[in-house]
Swiss-Prot record:
Belongs to the YajQ family. This is Nucleotide-binding protein CbuK_1936. NCBIfam families: PRK05412.1. Keywords: Nucleotide-binding. Gene3D superfamilies: 3.30.70.860, YajQ-like, domain 2.
Length: 160
């Protein structure tokens, strides 16, 4: 039976490259000279440090531009609240990866509401969709691309 997987993965190497490029741009920009503004990439988060809230907003914009240039979907980013102290400001950007249970259930409900002859099952952080006809699977992919789920989705392991 034909099947495919729905997932939301993040290319860590590209994220690291985007953060390095953003650090280089902040180091060379005139409005950031001497401010000590930096990005720190650790695991599933990026920590932004600057002197003011305004600089943090500029740094987020720079990071989003670098993500876009590296073909990383900006929807992977979730901004935490900034921590602003006397002469420093800090903000954490969480990187979302994988499909959580609530999003997986929402995806399965969307598929079942279409009454197509396919089955969808949650497998860890992926959703596997199987069906008898390849056309049904392609219509599921089209449906999910149109819907607003809140996660960037990738479709892979398409097997006949």
């Amino acid at each position: 039976m034909p099947s495919f997987d729905i997932q939301s993965e993040l290319n860590k190497h590209e994220v690291s490259n985007a953060v390095d490029q953003a650090n280089r741009e902040v180091a060379t920009r005139f409005d950031f000279k001497g401010s000590g503004a930096t990005y720190k990439y650790e695991g599933n988060s990026i920590t932004l440090q600057a002197e003011t809230d305004f600089q943090l907003k500029q740094m987020i914009d720079i990071l989003q531009n670098k993500f876009a240039k590296r073909q990383i979907d900006v929807a992977h980013m979730r901004l935490e609240d900034p921590i602003i102290q006397h002469k420093s400001a800090q903000q954490t950007v969480m990187l979302l990866e994988g499909i959580d249970q609530t999003a997986a259930k929402k995806i399965i409900k969307l598929i079942k509401d279409q009454k197509l002859k396919v089955q969808a099952a949650i497998q860890g952080e992926k959703v596997r969709v199987t069906g008898k006809k390849r056309d049904d699977l392609q219509s599921v992919i089209g449906l999910l691309k149109e819907q607003e789920i809140g996660l960037p989705l990738q479709f892979d392991n398409f097997r006949d």
